[in-house]
């Protein structure tokens, strides 16, 4: 099993709803990925100046899935290397809506988006071939081992793990230790950190997501607040 390591609701195999209640991609994404979709004729995917030396015929296409942050990466890869992928791009002049639905269903067999938690589940259950995202969590590694699957981790890029504050918050610099103190509940107010006398509301991503796994990696043995 391959992991590329970078830091209408969908139903899974047992008919439970897949959703994180986000605003886009049927509740699976917190950002609109439309501009990164190959099917969008106005997509902003980076493109090569010449044809890729790696060209895969459709019978060789691998089923890709992954994290929200990684979607532009693997979508651009497929756009460059999957021979004939352009046939899935919408033609506004001739394509009817029911035809778009049919094309979407076939296209998403190869370039799917289920975000980290569900995409990883699909990987270890052999419903996708390559997962693009951050390192798997300890729980995800245990799940793979329980199924007798060995994960092959291939680093392809580096990314920064960035913490944001509200635009009205004057705090603009925190140490790693200060962040750890926030997320273990030791620091509960912005004032000691140079901010206003206000309670800290520390946002976390869903368990098993790439961002949450990276947060757990940073925290180490330090417990994280609920």
Model-derived features with residue positions:
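Flexible loop/hinge segments at secondary-structure junctions
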Residues: 3-226
């Amino acid at each position: 099993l391959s992991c590329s390591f970078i830091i209408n609701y969908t139903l899974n195999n047992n008919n439970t709803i897949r959703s994180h209640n986000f605003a886009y991609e049927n509740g699976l994404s917190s950002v609109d990925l439309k501009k990164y979709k190959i099917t969008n004729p106005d997509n902003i995917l980076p493109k090569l100046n010449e044809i890729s030396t790696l060209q895969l015929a459709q019978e060789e296409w691998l089923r890709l899935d992954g994290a929200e942050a990684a979607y532009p990466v693997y979508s651009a890869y497929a756009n460059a290397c999957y021979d004939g992928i352009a046939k899935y791009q919408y033609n506004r002049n001739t394509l009817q809506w029911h035809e778009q639905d049919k094309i979407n269903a076939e296209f998403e067999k190869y370039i799917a988006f289920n975000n980290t938690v569900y995409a990883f589940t699909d990987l270890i259950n052999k419903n996708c071939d390559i997962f693009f995202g951050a390192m798997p969590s300890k729980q995800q590694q245990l799940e793979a081992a329980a199924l007798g699957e060995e994960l092959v981790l291939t680093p392809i890029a580096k990314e920064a793990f960035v913490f944001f504050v509200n635009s009205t918050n004057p705090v603009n610099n925190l140490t790693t230790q200060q962040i750890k103190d926030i997320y273990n509940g030791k620091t509960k107010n912005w004032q000691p950190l140079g901010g206003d006398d206000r309670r800290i509301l520390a946002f976390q991503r869903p368990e098993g997501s790439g961002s949450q796994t990276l947060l757990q990696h940073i925290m180490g043995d330090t417990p994280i607040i609920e």
